């Protein structure tokens, strides 16, 4: 097997948010094993350093970016810092998210609402603003935004989270439409479905996690969506069904 086949992302730079645990951590490691240099974004320096050790063991390198995604100006500065150091960005994984309050909408506190919108939706919009020019400089820019099946279900008490993910999906689809014919950038969404993560355990405390797919299984699908050979854009990869789906508006 050639090195290109074994490490198809060699020489590429990938930014992953929420990189210190769950799907984000597994994705960062999968991309590293495929040869990418990882720009790992997370809130906790200690957890980022642990990830760095794991990436080195995987045979790759990382740049650690401690950042609270509610820090809008910090996100705005991120793109410039990446450009100065690397000149471009090849892959963006918008994974970081919070569950928010599992509360009737009429009882959600404004700060809880604002925090969920800030992390799950506004941060990704600011990341688009910050990273879009860098991704367009790549010969095969790829962006994957991690969504949720909650975006399609009007389920009691899930309103805050569902609204943020529905907004994220339209953000991603609009971005994909805007760049489709003017650059090599491809933008897609992924629904991981029920996965063995801390967030899932918080939402379903009585569930047996051993019955759920692991973050590593989901990460393998995200990796495929980041390869230059993956050319779909504006689509949703539904991990539970292993299907790539086009969005169908109401008649």
Per-region residue spans from a language model:
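Conserved glycine-rich cofactor-binding loop
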Residues: 13, 20-22
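Active-site helix of classical SDR
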Residues: 128, 164
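Alpha-helical segment proximal to the catalytic Tyr-Lys
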Residues: 133, 177-181
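Residue(s) in the substrate-gating loop at a strand-loop-helix junction
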Residues: 148
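C-terminal helical subdomain
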Residues: 185, 189-190, 197, 205-251
